[in-house]
Every structure is written in C-alpha cells, then in structure tokens.
Amino acid sequence: MLNSAACIVLAITAVLGRMIYTHFYSNTCAAMKRALAHIPELHFEEDDTPERYRTETRSLVRKGYERYLQYGIPFQMRNPVSELGNQVVLPVKYLEEVKRAPRSLYSFEAFSEKVFLLKYIDAPRQTDALLYAVKLDINKNMDHILNGLWDETQVLLKETVPVTGQITIPGGELACNIIARTMSYVLVGPSLCRNPEWTKIAIEATFALVAGTQGLRDRYSPGWRWLARFQRSSEKLGEVREKAMELIKPLHEERMKALKDDSGQFRNFYDTIFWTMNKRKVDRSLRAIVDQQLFLTLASIHTTAGTLQSILCDWLAHPEYHDEILAEINERLAAFKGAGGKWTQQEVNEMKKLDSFMKESTRVNPVGCMTVQRYAQRTHTFSDGFVLPAGTIFQFPSDAVHHDPKLFPDPEKFDGHRFLRLREKDANAYHYGYVSDTTLNWGAGTHACPGRFLATYVLKFAFIALITQYDLSFPEGTGKPGYFYFDNSVRIDPTAKLDIKKSS
C-alpha cells in the first residue's frame, strides 16, 4: 500500500504530467498544422463531420485524385485519428523516392506504432528475422509447401460442407476459416494448423489488437495515455498470447532441440517458427517466437480472407467468364492428376485467365484504398522541392490509381480479361503478385508485401477447390453484397451469406 506522502507525490506528478503533456500536445498540433500549410487541404463539401472520414474516405480520395494527385500535387485531409494531425496523400511521382528511402526517414513500423498504439497495448511487432523468413525462406521453399496448401484446403472444405445437402454460411466466415487453416500450415506447420484452438487464435488476434487500441483511446485521452503502461491495457490480446504460447511451446522445444543437436532434423521443418528461429541474432525465447507468429496472423489472415470473399462474389456476379476459366482449370487439374496429384508452381502459373480474373477482382474490390503508409521521422525535401515535414503520416492512393481511366480504360467496368491482355504485351508483368507504380495492391518496391506469392497460391487453391468441387450461389433474392468502410479499409460485407453444397 502507498502511504499518504507517496499518494500526494503521485497525484502531483500526474497533474504536472498532464499539464506538461497538454501544453506540449497543443503546441505540437499547432506546429504540425503550420508545417503542412503549403499542402492543399481537402474537405467534404457538406456535413464535414469526423464520422464521414471513417466511412467515406474512398470517395474523398477519388475526388482528391481528380483535383490534385493526377496533376502531381499532394493534398492533406483529416485523419480519423485526430490526435495524429492531418494525413497527407502523395501522387505516384514521389513513389520511387519513398521506395528508396531508408526506414530511418520513412517508417512503416513507426506508422503502426502511432496508429495502433502498439507500445501501450504490448502488441506483437515485426522483426527483421521474421521479414527475412517470409521474404526468403517461404519463397525458396515454395515447392515443399505448395501441395500442403492444396491438401489443407481440401480437408477444411470437407470438414465444413456436408457430403449431402446445402449449408448457408457468411462469406466472411467461410473465407476466414479457409485462409486461417492454409496460412497456418506455413506459419505453425501441419501438426498445429488443424487444431481448432489455434484457428481461433489466428482469427481472433486481429480483433484483440483492434479492440485493445480502441479501448485505450476510449479510456485515455492522449494526455493521460501514459498511465496505461501501468495497467493491463489489452486483456484480450494478453489472453490470446497466453493461449498461443501454450499451443506453440511443444513446437518451439522441438525446433530448439533440432537446432542444438545439428543432426539434420531441421530439414524436416517447413514453417515460419523454425525459419525465424534459424536466423542469426534472433531472440529465440518462446514469447518472442509466439509474438512473431501472432504478427503474421495480423498481417495475413483477414486481408487475404477479404480478398477471397471478393473474388468469390465476383465469380457469382459474372457467369460470362465461367466456361473459359473452368476449361483452363480442368486442363491443369488433368495434368495435376497425371503427375500423381502433385502441383508445381509452373502448373499453377499457367492458369492465366484465372489469374487475370482474380487480379481484376482485387482491383475493383481492394482491402484498402491506400498503400505504402509511412510516418516521416525527419523533414525531407523531394527532388522537385516539395517538403514533407517530420511527424507526417502519409500514403499513396492505390484505389484511385487503379480507377484512373488513363491507366485502366473504363475503370468502373469489371473486365476479367483486362490483365490477360496486358500480359500479352509483357508476359512477365501484370500477374497476380506483380507490383509496379500502377498496380499497388501489394505495396511497392522492396517494401512490397513479402508474402504476396504465398497469398497468391493460397487464394488460387481456395478458389479452384470451391468452384470445381462445390456449387456456390447467393441466397435467393440477394446478389453481390455492398462494402464495409472503416478509415482507409474496404471490404465486402463479411456477414453476407453464401449457399454452398458439394457438386453432384
């Protein structure tokens, strides 16, 4: 128990801390506003309320693209997290300089800290060891994991859909269960990926982080947020971590033993637990390794599931593409069966009509309307003289770029052959995992999503299995669902239902 003198000291410290922080915070906001004064500000013309910046960002950024960005002019707009000051949207002409900039100048990690309050809720973070495991080890070992992804898709769907009869299931739930299972095959390996307790963790980790961040903002104003460090600010995230540690502990011990014995047993492990532990200068403690797996679930499960749901909805909404795509798939399935039921990357990549359809769906239905989101850690002057002040959160308008009629003619029309035609001009470009200054779904440059090739195979296998082995349809009286918007995020309504049954 604190004595009365200690209580008085604590109270005085809290009050003084509040006064100092409030003064600093107010002055910082004013200084930030002055620092951005040279950048045009975009508002909603009517009803310019904070709520509209949470739910209508996509339409406002499209207007900003037409008014400013297509002419190479940046603009600023309100940040839904008002304490961070206005966010800046940059035209693509600055993308090359941002791609080449070091993290000490423009940082995604700092952006995440600011937006999600990671240090206050003790959230998992990405490490360099994990980044290299995803970027190098997964891609290098893709041939070893490819057929496991296909097998897990098959098993999950057999568990979900009865042999006879039809079920009705929310599209988001179906997609999330498939992606959680198949991604987990690579994250934690075959022995844990089918465990329902792990699947629950893989799905709930993102919700726990968002709830922790929002709860912290609801309970503490910026001036008092430092107090959260002395409390358990995200109980749900803590519970998720504790359960994950319990489940991963045997795998962690098994891989630690293999590394110490150096007996060659490590060659049997094809998962990010081992690949992360096998890096030099890495924290191999159970807590650290578990946090890396939780970070991967945050980065991969819900975004990929939202993408899969969108692709399925576009498939049902555009039956005019069914015959030719199914013919292409069936040709490759015949080759797959002829090879003893083994996929190769080449066989999957040969399905170019399928690839084009999926890429068009992702262009039309992004999981976010922004990309390359960064926090400016220092003031920087670009080559044309434009100054971006330190402390600025900025990003690039991927959705608006993908709807620029000069780049994508008739952009509001769904054209499943769009990228097939583009690939005829350049066979190495415009495939699903391709990144460029005009195809920005995966980010850009060396900072592009390192797991995009894994996600591509996961999505293709799920899509192929669903449309060749099952009958899918929208429930009677319904069609393609509408969108949910939140801040810069977009996705098809995850609660919208699908009817599914085993094909006869």
UniProtKB/Swiss-Prot annotation:
Q: Where is the signal peptide?
A: 1-17
Loss of this gene results in the following: Leads to the loss of pyrichalasin H production, but accumulates novel cytochalasans, all lacking a hydroxyl group at C-7.
Q: Which cofactor does it need?
A: heme
PROSITE patterns named among the record's database cross-references: CYTOCHROME_P450 (PS00086)
**Pathway(s) where this gene product acts:** Mycotoxin biosynthesis
Which leading EC class covers this enzyme? oxidoreductase
Q: Which residues bind heme?
A: C449
Single biological process term from Gene Ontology? secondary metabolic process
Enzyme Commission designation: 1.-.-.-
The record describes the protein's role as: Cytochrome P450 monooxygenase; part of the gene cluster that mediates the biosynthesis of the mycotoxin pyrichalasin H, a tyrosine-derived cytochalasan that inhibits the growth of rice seedlings, but also inhibits lymphocyte capping and actin polymerization and alters cell morphology. Pyrichalasin H is indicated as the responsible agent for the genus-specific pathogenicity of M.grisea toward crabgrass. The first step in the pathway is catalyzed by the O-methyltransferase pyiA which methylates free tyrosine to generate the precursor O-methyltyrosine.
Name the family: Belongs to the cytochrome P450 family.
**The protein's name in its UniProt record:** Pyrichalasin C-7 hydroxylase
What is the native source organism of this protein? Pyricularia grisea
